[in-house]
Amino acid sequence: MHRVMIHPASYDSCRRSVDRAFELFPQDIAQKKVVIKPNVLRMSTAEEHIVTHPQLLRAVVERVEQMSPAQIVVGDNPGLFNYGDNERSFEKTGLMAAAKGYYKNLGNTPQTLAFDSDFLAEVGVSKE
């Protein structure tokens, strides 16, 4: 059976919601590499609601830190408007600081994979 979580939250109190989500949906990440991928569509401010809010990213990073992973990587590869402009996109959105030093440019290690689709024969993804 599928489960969802609906929890009242604000960006100021999102840490409680993140903690609750990890309680309801436990993850075994001890000694594993964890990639946290915020949604970075383009350079914008948090108030524009175009990217993952920095306070939410920070809450997730801090929760994952407590779970003893072998490695944490925070990254995305902003598409269309700012494709390949990762560092500037993370800086402008406030996500670089929220990543707490775990940021990695996922656009630096691209690879092409076959993609069985009516629309695309292949797709580019990060090796990370």
Model-predicted regions and their roles:
Residues 1-128:
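N-terminal and secondary-structure boundary signal
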